[in-house]
Amino acid sequence: VKTLKFNGTIIPDALGPVYDFIKRSNVTPKTMTDFLENAKGEDVLLSMSSGGGEITAASDMYTALKKYPGKVNVEITGNSASAATIVMLGADHVAISPVHQ
């Protein structure tokens, strides 16, 4: 199983370099599509902790997950709020502790 640490703010691809420069955790649609392309249809796990972010970027990630041929699992390791819930809903299976948000 390939794993992506999905931590930080969901942002458009164009803002990725800015967030990287100021050392802010982020995930972009390109992060997701590159990860899925490298997984080559294997089952994947998104280890997620995100307070959300930009809805269009989250929608692009949701679409990429729904099109992915392998099984997509999400494990909420911190929180999943706002736009992050859109991404989470693209998974085949979501695991979340009752004490997580």
Residue ranges and their predicted role:
Residues 1-101:
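Terminal-region recognition feature
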